[in-house]
């Protein structure tokens, strides 16, 4: 049992009303420190620091001003101070676009999905339960993507939309029976997606052409990447365009907005061979 009157124990500190983070979370306290110093032969914490820190970087209290780190804070005071600092941020409307969107994550989804401990265990987080919960979460995610894209299978998943687009380009190259060497990318594709496709294609020696569909020569390309909605927000029905390209021997990848797919005709129903997109739309905040 823990002695509540032991000034060096956590229980003792809390019993005395000492709710500072430094007492609760920063290493040992009281008799523990004394015993540890005696074990290693150091007379004090200052002596230990003087022996271990090189003199060229050691702050000498006798010659230099002490660090102004303030007094220890209680948990409530520390959280209030952090909230005050965060409130100084100015939140502006984002016009970044290019497939990146400001999002809202409804509290029921955050608590019951993202923070639901049932995904990994009902008691102690053993690895087996974490793996089982992760497997279930991935299965649900993949089924949702299948429903939204209209495809038969889905993975879970790649780094981002641009990486997925580059992987689609190489997958279509392997799946295609066409002798044409090039890959066509619609000009309305998000700019970062175009750049990653170009970078991947460079080392695979795949010629990439960025342009509009009406200028496309089907005999030059084995595959095409289309964007719907495109990077400027235009929405189209690609059914006829995809059918025309496939009739000419091209494989077609469509980059889509999965949230828009809730209302739009799915890319799979329009005939796409591969569908890619970004799950950032489902409530992941933007980070800079």
Describe the role of every protein-language-model region.
Residues 1-28:
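Charged, compositionally biased N-terminal leader segments and the immediate start
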Residues 163-288:
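Conserved PLP-enzyme active-site core in the AAT-like
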Residues 126-130, 134, 147-166:
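Short loop-beta-helix segment that forms the pyridoxal 5′-phosphate
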Residues 15-16, 116-128, 144-151, 178-180, ...:
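Gly-rich Lys/Arg/Thr-decorated short loops/hinges at beta-loop-alpha junctions or inter-strand turns
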Residues 28, 51-55, 59-140, 146:
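N-terminal entrance/gating region of PLP-dependent enzymes' catalytic architecture
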Residues 42-58, 65, 272-277:
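TRNA-binding/sensing appendages of the translation machinery
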Residues 27-50:
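Mature N-terminal segment immediately following signal peptide/propeptide cleavage
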Residues 74-79, 142, 154-179:
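Conserved beta-loop-alpha segment that forms the PLP phosphate-binding cup at the N-terminus of a helix
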């Amino acid at each position: 049992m823990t002695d509540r009157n032991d000034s060096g124990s956590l229980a003792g500190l809390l019993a005395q009303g000492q709710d500072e983070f430094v007492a609760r979370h920063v290493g040992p306290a009281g008799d523990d420190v004394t015993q540890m110093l005696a074990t290693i032969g150091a007379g004090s914490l200052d002596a230990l620091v003087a022996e271990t820190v090189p003199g060229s970087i050691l702050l000498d209290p006798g010659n230099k001003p002490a660090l102004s780190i303030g007094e220890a804070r209680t948990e409530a005071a520390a959280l209030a101070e952090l909230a005050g600092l965060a409130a100084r941020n100015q939140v502006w409307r984002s016009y970044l676009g290019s497939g990146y969107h400001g999002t809202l994550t409804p509290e029921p989804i955050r608590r019951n999905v993202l923070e639901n401990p049932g995904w990994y265990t009902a008691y102690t987080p053993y690895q087996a339960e974490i793996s089982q919960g992760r497997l279930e979460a991935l299965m649900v995610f993949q089924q949702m993507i299948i429903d939204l894209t209209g495809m038969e299978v889905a993975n879970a998943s790649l780094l981002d939309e641009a990486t997925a687009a580059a992987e689609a380009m190489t997958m279509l190259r392997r799946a295609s029976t066409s002798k044409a060497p090039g890959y066509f990318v619609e000009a309305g594709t998000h700019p970062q997606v175009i750049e990653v496709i170009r970078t991947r294609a460079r080392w695979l020696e795949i010629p990439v052409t960025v342009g509009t569909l009406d200028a496309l020569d089907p005999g030059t390309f084995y595959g095409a990447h289309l964007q719907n909605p495109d990077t400027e927000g235009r929405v189209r029905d690609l059914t006829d365009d995809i059918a025309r390209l496939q009739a000419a021997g091209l494989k077609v990848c469509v980059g889509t907005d999965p949230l828009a797919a809730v209302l739009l005709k799915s890319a799979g129903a329009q005939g796409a061979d591969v569908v890619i997109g970004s799950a950032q739309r489902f409530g992941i905040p933007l980070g800079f």
